Amino acid sequence: MVSLTKRVLFEVIPNPPDETTLTLSSTTNKGHYISVRPFVNAEGKEFPFEWAFGGTSDHIELKKINERANSLNFNFKFDTNVKLNVPETHRGVIKTVFKTWDSGLVEETGSVFPWGTEGTEVKFRELWQPVDPTRLEFVELNNEKDVDQAANSIALSVDNEEYEGLVIVVGRWIQGILFKKGVNTLDGINLFRSQIDEKNSIVSLVKFGADADKFPQEVLLNEGSITTSKGLEWSVIESNL
């Protein structure tokens, strides 16, 4: 099921909750996913993101707990913290539980181990508001299941000797991660968030990185298609067009 959710609360327990980003997480019908988390106030920040990560359906395990809750175990293919070798960064599987409230908000709980699996467990909690991916403005959905099943669900990927990346399209919203292999600095990280307007043109909202112009300029493509941007070939690994 296509999903676009906006984070409205982040809490590292036992600290008080807060939200300093405009975080959106996108998931396609087949389970390919990406989360891009730019700071609302990025002034003075060399890297204006709290975090960004993503992966294909091979990098997530979902199990149903009951009608309202699922366990999701993530093992990200793309993780900016790992890419940058940020100290005290969790590596490996992150176990989470997603529970839908009566209001339609989705609570995510889980824990990470920044000092390794033998180190101290750090618990966290996030709250997500499902939004309509077919709209250019943020329109809240009463329930994530209310999303238009005909909404665009497209994923593009690249993996060659120099680059690896993933782009997710849900409805009118596009998010992408592109890493330059072997470059574990900000020079090796590219992120973007865009929208598809009424004329099917791509309008950039967030763009970061020296190679950000290599993100695909056309995304409304059939599965199996190839598109090239600034010499970089992207393969469409999922499309419902």
From Swiss-Prot:
Location of this chain's protein in the cell: Cytoplasm; Nucleus
Keywords of the record: Cytoplasm, Nucleus
One Pfam family matching this protein: HRI1
Signal peptide: none
Cross-referenced InterPro entries: Hri1, Hri1_N, Hri1_N_sf
Gene Ontology CC terms: cytoplasm; nucleus
Family: Belongs to the HRI1 family.
Protein name from the UniProt record: Protein HRI1
Gene (name only): HRI1
